[in-house]
């Protein structure tokens, strides 16, 4: 990791803590605000710990872009959680063969940038 990317990553990590400190839930209720602040902190810690040993500059850049997108989307929509996405359904393809491979490729490419670190299957 270069010194410039290290500083950028540390700045993003600090911005998550600043964001959590200033966060207000859209509902205005204190319980919701506390839960959402805790979610922001836990999510940041988990993802930064998961990616701390990356050495490939391209992967580091992707993670930085994902982090920036998550911050911007959270601020714009006033929700700390990733926005739900609609992936192509797999109900019409056979269990094996080209159709399944095509559907899996579509699902892989249709996953937005801000969800690349999530291992969840929709």
Swiss-Prot record:
CDD domains: Complex1_LYR_LYRM1. Belongs to the complex I LYR family. May promote cell proliferation and inhibition of apoptosis of preadipocytes. This is LYR motif-containing protein 1. It comes from Rattus norvegicus (Rat). The gene is Lyrm1.
């Amino acid at each position: 990791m270069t010194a410039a990317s290290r500083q950028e990553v540390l700045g993003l990590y600090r911005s998550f803590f600043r964001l959590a400190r200033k966060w207000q839930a859209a509902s205005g209720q204190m319980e919701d605000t506390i839960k959402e602040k805790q979610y922001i902190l836990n999510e940041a810690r988990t993802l930064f710990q998961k990616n701390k040993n990356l050495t490939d500059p391209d992967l580091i850049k992707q993670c930085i872009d994902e982090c920036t997108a998550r911050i911007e989307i959270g601020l714009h929509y006033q929700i700390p959680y990733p926005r739900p996405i609609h992936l192509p359904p797999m109900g019409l393809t056979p269990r094996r063969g080209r159709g399944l491979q095509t559907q899996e490729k579509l699902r892989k490419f249709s996953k937005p940038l801000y969800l690349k670190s999530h291992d969840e299957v929709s």
